[in-house]
Every structure is written in C-alpha cells, then in structure tokens.
Amino acid sequence: MCWTAKSFIRGLSYSVKYCSKDNHLQKIHLYSKLKPKKCHILDWSGSTCNSTVPPGSILPWRFFSCKEGTEIPCKRKKIASITTPELLYKDLLKSEQKNWNEISGRYKAMAKRIKKKIEELHKKYTFSSESPRIKVGESVYFEENGCIFLSKTDDVDEGNVRILFSAEDLGFDDAFIQRIRISPDQRYMATSLKSENSEEATCVVMKLGGFPVVEKVIPNVFSFEWVSNDVLYYTSQKNLKCQDVFMTTFTKQKHTELVYTEQDARFFVDIYCTKDRRFLTINSNSKTTSEVWLVDCRHPFKSPVLVQARTKGVIYHIEHRNDELYILTTYGEPAEYKLMKAPVSSSGMENWQLVYALEEKTKLVDLEMFSDHCILFLQNAGHLYLNVISFVSHSVQSIKLPAWACAFELESHPEHTTSTCYFQLTSPVHPPKRFAYSFKENNLIEQAVQEVPIITNCHTTRLLAKSKDETLVPITVFHNTNSKELHRKPLLVHVYGAYGMDLNMSFKEEKLLLIEEGWILAYCHVRGGGELGHSWHKDGCQHNKLKGLDDLKACIMLLHELGFSQPKYTALAAASAGGVLAGALCNSNPELIRAMVLQAPFIDVLNTMMKTHLPLTIEEQEEWGNPLADEKCMKYIKSYCPYHNIKPQCYPSVFITAYENDQRIPLTGVLRYVQKLRKAALDHAGRTKKKGNWIPNIILDIQANGSHCDSSWEDSLSEVARQLAFLKKELEDV
C-alpha cells in the first residue's frame, strides 16, 4: 500500500499540523541509502525528514534538452512578509542573534567533538546498500546523487546504466528528488523536486527515449500519478493547502483541466493508485473524516465516482482486488481501524463487510496489499507483530517480531504479484536489519546483506506509568547494561502526544552515542499520540489535552521512583507539536527536570488558533478545538498553552532550535516565547535573592537555512551536536 497508506494509518489527515507543524508524509524516497539521514535527538513522531545527497559513485553529465517554450521555475522562494510588526520582529531577531553569538562559544569545542563521534558512528552503522528501485517490466529505475538512472538488468554497473535525469542540470542545485512515477508504457517519467528551504515541490515530466526531453514543468505539486500511458493526475499545493486535482494529457492535443475541488478548508486532498493500478483514488481527508473518489484507470477521462460520502468521525482508505474494494476504516464499534470489503459496483458503507478487526489496544502501524495476501504490521504492548491474511485460504497467521524492534520501514513493492514482502526493523539504538516474509514458505527470513555490528551493551525495558485518572501509559527505556548507580546517570525523556502520531523510534547514531556514554533514554507514549490505537489519540486531543500532560508527569515521576536518574540529571526533548506538552510541563512541574531541548516547537497554541487567516488554523480545530466559537475551549487551551502560562519561578534551562524559513511555525511566536520565559526566570531570581541562586540558560539557536522538516545532513548534524553539547553542560556538570 506504499507511502500513502502509511501516512493514512499514522494519522490520515495530510492537512493536519503534523502536516502543518510536522510534515510527516511518508514518501517513497528514491535516493541513495548512502545519503546521510537527518539527525534528531528530538524524536518528533514518524518523521522522514529529507536531506541532501552526498557524492555518489555515478556522476551526472548533460544529456537532455528542454522542449521549446518549457520554463524551469526559479526555486529561490521569497519568504512571505511577517504579519507581526516588522520592526518588532527585527528587534527580537537581532537581540536573539546577538545573545547566541555571545554564548555559543561555550559549546563550540564540545559540539565539535560530539559531531566527530556521530560521524564515526554513522560510518560504522551505515552501509553502501543499493538504492531503492522501481522495476517496470525488464527495466530498473533508481536514483543516486540527484540523478535518475535506467538499467535493463538487475546487475547495475556503469556499463549498462543510462542517465535519464539530473536535478543539477535542470537548475535545481539545492533540491532533492522526492518522488518518481513512470508511465505504464515507460514513455514518460514524472519526478518531483523539493528544496530544503521550501514546502512546495516542482514536478518535472520528461519524455523518455534515446534523448530524454523535458516535456512539462508543473510548480507547486503535492502528489501525482500516471492514470494511463499519457494521462497524469496531480494535486496542487498552495499556502500549505492542497484542495485541487488536475488532469494533464500528453497526447497530440495536450490540455490540462480541473477534475476535483475540495470546498471545505478542513480537508486536504491527496491522490494515489491502488496497488493493482485499477483505480486512481482521490482522497479528501480531515483529521477525523474521509471521502474517497475513484477514477477508473481504463477510462481516465470519465468523471470520478464517489465511494462513500463523508460521514463525521469515519476515516477510510481504499485498495482494490478482484473487483472488490478493500477498505481500511474506523467505521463501526470499536472506532479502531479494521479491514472491510465491498463490491466496486455497490461501495456504500451499508455494503461493507468485515474482513479483519484488531484486538483491543492494538495499533495498526501499516498495511500492504498483494494479489493473494494482505500483511498487517501491528503493535501491542510495545511489541511488533505481522499478521498475514490469506485471501485464498481465508486464514490469518500471526508472527511476533524480534523483541528489540521498536519500529519498521516497509520497502516498496511495485509488483503486487510478488511472493515476498521486504521490510526493515530498527530501534533508536539498533541499526536497521532487513527481513523478508515469504508467502510461499510462510516464514520470516533475516536478510544478511551485510553484517551489522551487534549492539550488546544496551538493555530495553518497557514500563507502565499510572496517570492521574488511573490510565496506564507505556514507557520504553534504554540504558547501558554496564551502567551502575542509574539514579546518578543523565536521563533524556522524549515526548510528542499529538495528531495520533507515534514517537519516532527509528535508529539514530546520536542515541547510541548517549547510551555508550552511560545516558538513559526514555520514550513516553502519552495520550494524544497513536501508540495504542485511534482511541489513544482521541483521549488526548481537544478537551482532553491535559490528559497528555498528566501522562507525561506520571511517566517522569515513575522513572525517578524506579531509580532511573533524578530531577537534577533529567532533560526533556520534544519537537514541533510535542513542544505543547513539554512546554506545559515546564510551567506546571519545572522541578521534575533540569533542562529542556525543543526543535521548531509549537508553543503558542491559543494565539495561533485565534488567527483563522493563517493557512492551517481551521484544519487544526479538530486537534485543538475552536477558541473563537467556544469560550470554554478558549479557557481550556489557555490553561495549558506554554506561552500563556509562563510565570516567575525556577525554570529549567532551555535550548530551542528554530528556522527562519519555517512556514508552519512562524519564528515570531518562538521569539516572543523565549523573551517572556527569560524575563520570568530572571524576575524569579531577582525576587528570591538567595545565595547561589541558579539562573537557567534560555537559548535560542536560529537557523537561516532549512525549514520545518528539511535540513541538509551537515546542518542537521551541527544542530544535534550543539543540542547535545548543551545537554552535557547542563546535566553532566551538575
């Protein structure tokens, strides 16, 4: 079911602020695995942030021409004007930049050492495996170093590889390849390119052949699919919204026309093809409700047909097999995801029949359809499982995955008739391992492509903390098996708790570095996230947001009670919308932590939700509520909003990384938060006047490059090094 299904299951709405605060669209990134991934000590949920590609083994050369009249748009995007008074913004920005220049020197030497260690770990645990490939018939397409190559055999070497596309030669020097789609007859290739400093992508359509030619350039494209040999459907993104679907043809009489428009500002439109390429699906999703339209790929010019009209609170997603629609949906009780089916000719929900229902408190992480099977990736009590449904024998086989695994990455399977499903398992401190499930053999096989060094000095513990209302909240803890006196070791606590998204539990070299140096890592799976299913999210959004805060407090207190560190050695890490709970705890219980590190944090909920002119505010109402229409909601948001609850008290030290180009969380709000927090901390210190009174460090590191989800490898590595240097100074020098 590829990337769209994963996004769908992990929160569904592509317009929500994990797609507004956090752009967590799970795309098939067709770039070399040699490419360093973005470092994050701050695990915002599920994020696959893109970064630039380092030099590869195959070098590009000039090879194609642009069709006459085809213009390549400039990607040097101008930043939108600031809505707050320009002078105030400039003064605040200049003040924080000056402050950073004055204090950054104290972290420079340590950050340099940390950066070197992370690079060494990256070399040790990252292997030169081949790029993900698209197989179409006898042809193999793959991407490396910003270029797309074609090979007619599986044996890829410079002798039998032909270059089709180079981002650099097209003038996209700072862009990376985001997605590739090949037309069924392989005459055309559509590729999207995205800059690190911009949310918008550009789609370049090339006519293949002996001498590839740029046929069309489409700016501001979000998703696109070939419906037939010469008909491309795509969605247009404007101001972070995606509500229009267009069809463009590459026949003799070329034309482009609008096919679908979404009128409701709460909904975001995305398209993809079913696995068997029988239908193109037009998916209009809010954060709680779905509506899907089908375009028959055999008749691409016919109007889309509605599957089921949107019903409040019902989320659904469509796949196809043998003239039946397979529907992944929250319809029915309990309101968790379940697999249902219906005939194509009568697709209304009155005809939906149950195929498979999840057990209680089980999270559906992903689903992949094949011709005769369906694989469900499940999570229960912190453990990962495979459930394999056979459409032939009507049986279900359940396989428990290795206990160390905390996350998985499903590899793309362009051929739905394949007999093997490939995926990778990982954890924050375990490098990815490749596995294969064989439908023929009914077994799981570990693919030892290259020996991965075994991590033997890390112990994993799964705990349950009792929250204020008696709800049990999962915690995943990692620590060095050789560590003694854990109550004296530094503890880094991670939290998110929004949009039904899980904490990111994939491998990060910097996490392993901390474990090797004796740190404890804790991941608090609080309500508002999705770790325990759809209801876990509902129980932590809108008027239930404070439950997530109660959960976080209970988790940290349990960790300390069990001897995992103590407050003066404890730090809290969060990013984007995770900043709400982290910032709220910093106000309500600052005594529980010594330091806090935030990345692109959402910390002014009330002011943001009061400004409907912002592009994403209306979409956010299903997560946070509508304070303009509901005074009770306004008071509730104000009760936990990090910015509005700052007061003179003894705060922990705080390090915030923010981006000038962040279109999702404007820098002005972060600047105001830092100024207010620093003033409150200084006011408290001035009032108490105790001997040796501790004054926290409140630091804002503003990045001119990068955006909310995208930074180069070098920039992100430097960011992480500075964050770790700050944490070490705060926790190890106590």
Model regions and ranges:
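N-terminal chloroplast transit peptides
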Residues: 1-47
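Active-site-proximal cap/loop segments of hydrolase catalytic domains
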Residues: 526-734
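Structured, non-catalytic alpha/beta "coupling" segments that mediate domain-domain communication
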Residues: 131, 136-146, 325-326, 336, ...
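Beta-propeller folds
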Residues: 2-14, 58-391, 395, 504, ...
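Secondary-structure transition/capping motifs at alpha-helix termini
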Residues: 155-157, 196-197, 211, 298-301, ...
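C-terminal substrate/ligand-recognition segments
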Residues: 332, 369-372, 376-380, 465-471, ...
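Glycine-rich His-Gly loop
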Residues: 330, 426, 494-499, 576, ...
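Cap/lid segment of the alpha/beta-hydrolase catalytic domain
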Residues: 169-178, 440-441, 448-571, 575-576, ...
